[in-house]
Every structure is written in C-alpha cells, then in structure tokens.
A protein has these predicted regions:
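Surface-exposed amphipathic alpha-helical tracts and adjacent flexible/coil segments at the periphery
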Residues: 1-22, 27-30, 34, 59-69, ...
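Glycine-rich, positively charged N-terminal anion/phosphate-binding segment
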Residues: 38-57, 191
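Alpha-helix capping/helix-boundary segments
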Residues: 100-101
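RNase H-like DDE/DDD metal-dependent nuclease/strand-transfer catalytic core used by mobile genetic elements
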Residues: 105
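Conserved catalytic-core segments of large NTP-driven translation/proteostasis enzymes
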Residues: 120
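Conserved nucleotide-cofactor-binding alpha/beta core module
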Residues: 125-126
Length: 386
C-alpha cells in the first residue's frame, strides 16, 4: 500500500522525547510550561522546548505542542506571547481545545497548523466542519466514536484524522468530565485531573470495586481496519508514562504499521511474543479495543484492582537473581552539593556516587508534610537492587 500513516508518540519529558524518536515515531506531541492537559508531567520550559523543536527536525520528525486546556479571560492575552518563540523556531502544529484560543492562534499565526484536541468533543461531522471553517487542518475525534463514524467524518470533510490507538481511556466523554473538579477541586479541563474514576467505589449492599475504571486501549491487531477507515495519525496515549513505555509501544506500532503497508492484510500478523512485550511494558487492567467496534460494552470495564507492570519478566528475574545488599552514605551539609555514595556490601571497591541540588535549610513557614494522613507501609518493602 502507498498510503502514509503517521505514528504520533507522547513525550512528558526530554527522555521520552528521545525514546520516541529512537523508536521510529513520525511526530511527537508534548506540553510546554503552560496550557497543557498534563500539568503534572515533566513538561519542558521555553529553552528546552526550543531545543526539542530543533532536535526532532534534525531527525526528520515533527513536534506538536499541546495547548489543550480551557483558557480563562486573562490568559488569552498571554497566549500569543507564549507561543511566539515556538512558532518562530518552527513548531509544526498546536493541539487546541478552546474555541477562543483557536481563533486567537489563527489570527496571530495564520500558517501555524491547528489540530483540534479530543478534549473539544468532536462527535459528528457538523462539528468537524465547523472547526474546518475556523482553519483547522486536523481533527482528533472524541474517543467514543466508532470506526464507521470516523470514516464518515473523514469522507465528509477531507480533514486529517488523528485517533488514539493505545493507552489509557477515560470513563467520561472526552473533554466533558467534571468529576475531578467536583470531588478534588482539580479540573481535567485545566490539566489537573486527579483520576477519580480509577478509585474503588462501594455500591449499597455490594463490595467495593473499581466500578468506573476502563481497561487500557490496544489496537495493534486492528491496524488494517484503522488504516482503511481513513485514520491518518495513530496516536499513543502516555505523556505521564516512562521512556521505556514510550519506546516499546512506539516501536511495536511502527513495526506492524510498516508490515501492513508493505504486505497488506495477507502478510499482517501480530506475534504472541510482541503482544507479551506490550503487556509487560504497561497494562493497567487488561486491554480492550475501545469504542471502535462496539459502543458501551461492559467488557471495557475492569472491576479488579490495578495490575500495573513496570518491566519484562526477564528484567524481574534478573533483579531477583542479582539482588545484593548495599551500603551507602548521604552527605547533606548546608551550602554544599548533596552527595550519595553506595557500594556493594561484600565488594566495597564497587562504588557509585551521584550528586544533586545545593543543600538549603528549610524555612519554618514551609510545610514539609501532612500529619492528617498515614502512609501504609506495613505491607510494603522497597529494596534497593544492583
């Protein structure tokens, strides 16, 4: 097949950015210091973001910046100045939720591509056409659409279509959740979702369970269907994930999209070993195929506790086999750089030293912790392994 399909990988840090590039992503989406829907990610400051734009361009890739929160009145006046240095550096696109922000960006930067965020809740063709008239070049439809609905939107508008293919799913409609704001005072539409849907809840006369927590999305087996539906960009969720997750998932989708584009359906088959690699990389509560084939299916829900995996079985076996006792010293003296040195208990000549920030005395007025909550440490162990 001659059609090109973009792999769009997440980056919540510089390390994740490098991992995405190395794994074969065509483009990376990342948040800056403001206006992004992942306020608690290790977002880049202005200097590092400018470096990131140059870095991906040197590797022949693209960088999309998230401006996907709802802006307040006073923030609109700051948005143009915030984006200007990135625009001048060659930023490839901005992903936007707020309609007012879209209009402002289009007026200030007429040739900067606008991508409509999934947070804008584009659920049908008329909405897509509205954004098209506003100058959008790409739509990220609401996650709740079926493949047939996505195909119709593509055919009716001719816009680029970007869809999530892997990662976490929200219980509520994209961009319409107020639960975090109501329960915890942290709005998902301001980049501070506390993920209350991941918590256990108790229904009357029943045991507590994770009643609103969806399984993670995985569409590696559906690549032929997604391509044929007209999806232009395969988006991987995970700006809060670690570099090894970004690398592994991006690499897998790169591999199998290329296989399908080169060999078609007859040559397309995802091996059991590669599926296991995806599962071992990160799996919250099992996988599902989202809303693409069946809407509102109860099989999307998991009532079990989270089963996050943070490494391969081989890595776990290696850690178990090589677990050794270590000794160490931590030097903290005011006005000096903090320094930690560790060594093997039975081989003191094998040492590692790392340094950190300058040590400062804490002010009395600075709260250093909370006394109204107790950490559950009785059943937890935190071994240090070399």
């Amino acid at each position: 097949m001659k059609r090109e399909v973009e792999i769009l990988a997440p980056a919540g840090s510089w390390e994740c950015l490098e991992a995405a590039v190395c794994a074969g992503a065509d483009a990376i989406y990342i948040g800056g210091s403001r206006f992004g829907a992942r306020a608690h990610a290790d977002n880049l400051n202005e200097e590092r973001m400018l470096e990131a734009i140059d870095y991906v361009h040197l590797h022949g890739r693209k960088l999309y910046m998230t401006v996907n929160t709802l802006l307040k009145e006073q923030e609109l006046g700051e948005l143009v100045d915030y984006l200007r240095p990135y625009y001048e550096q060659g930023l490839d696109a901005v992903i936007v939720q707020d309609i007012g922000a879209m209009r402002l960006i289009r007026e200030a930067f007429p040739d900067l591509p606008l991508h409509v965020s999934t947070q804008a809740t584009v659920t049908q063709t008329l909405s897509a056409q509205l954004f098209q008239r506003m100058g959008a070049e790409r739509i990220v439809p609401a996650r709740e659409l079926s493949l047939e609905e996505i195909k119709n939107m593509k055919n009716a508008t001719g816009l680029e279509i970007e869809c999530f293919v892997h990662g976490a799913l929200c219980y509520c409609y994209s961009g319409q959740c107020l639960m975090s704001s109501m329960i915890g005072g942290r709005s998902g539409n301001r980049g501070e979702c506390a993920q209350p849907c991941r918590l256990p809840y108790r229904v009357e006369n029943r045991k507590s369970a994770d009643l609103m927590s969806l399984k993670d999305l995985c569409t590696i087996d559906m690549i032929p269907e997604l391509v044929e539906a007209g999806i232009d960009s395969f988006k991987i969720e995970g700006r809060m994930k670690q570099p090894d997750y970004v690398y592994t998932v991006t690499q897998m989708y790169r591999k199998y999209i290329d296989i399908y584009l080169q060999k078609g359906k007859k040559g397309f088959h995802v091996t059991k070993e590669d599926k296991e690699k995806l599962e071992n990389c990160y799996r919250r509560r099992g996988y599902c195929d989202g809303y693409y084939r069946k809407q509102n299916g109860k099989e999307m829900l998991s009532f079990e506790a989270s089963r996050k995996r943070d490494g391969t079985e081989e890595r776990k076996k290696w850690i178990t086999y090589y677990r050794k006792k270590i000794d160490g010293t931590l030097n903290l003296a005011e006005g000096t750089v903090s320094e930690l040195t560790v060594w093997l208990h039975d081989r003191p000549e094998m040492t590692v030293t790392v340094t950190g920030d300058m040590v400062q005395t804490a002010k009395k007025s600075t709260p250093c912790g909370r006394t109204d909550r107790k950490a559950d440490t009785e059943n937890r162990k935190y071994p240090v392994c070399i």
